[in-house]
């Protein structure tokens, strides 16, 4: 991968959080949490709307991270990419009707030799997602591993 792109921040990507998308996500993850699955219950709650589960971050961040995957200058070998790790710092709750704006920054590219003597590259990215009021909803750190080839 192209080391010169460390520090690059990609354009902001906006995501409109729809109630149906939250319902779909909740069904896919087998959630029974009424804040995420029951419109009437959630509307009467102190949130006033259907609430996205914390892991919904993958939905709105994925669109922003596509810029990284599609960046030809980065020269990422996408078929060799596997998930390394991720960490999150959550802020405001994400609700249906919110507009989430996410930026992605490449914070590091590290080369490490694996046990087979092949060179893996670790791509470390950070995301920052704000709601329509400019409030932080999530900061993420994502590590992807490009497995070394022969």
Whereabouts are the PLM-identified features?
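Hot-dog-fold acyl-thioester-processing enzymes
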Residues: 1-85
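HotDog/MaoC-like acyl-thioester-processing domains
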Residues: 1, 90-150
């Amino acid at each position: 991968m192209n080391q010169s792109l460390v520090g690059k921040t990609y354009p902001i990507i906006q995501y409109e959080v729809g109630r149906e998308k939250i319902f779909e996500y909740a069904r896919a993850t087998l959630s029974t949490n009424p804040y995420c699955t029951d419109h009437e219950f959630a509307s009467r709650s102190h949130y006033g709307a259907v609430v996205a589960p914390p892991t919904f971050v993958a939905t709105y961040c994925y669109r922003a991270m596509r810029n990284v995957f599609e960046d030809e200058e980065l020269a990422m070998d996408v078929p060799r990419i596997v998930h390394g790790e991720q960490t999150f710092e959550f802020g405001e709750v994400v609700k249906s009707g919110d507009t989430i704006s996410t930026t992605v920054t490449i914070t590091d590219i590290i080369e490490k030799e694996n046990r087979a003597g092949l060179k893996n590259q670790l791509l470390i990215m950070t995301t920052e997602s704000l709601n329509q009021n400019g409030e932080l909803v999530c900061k993420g750190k994502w590590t992807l591993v490009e497995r070394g080839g022969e």
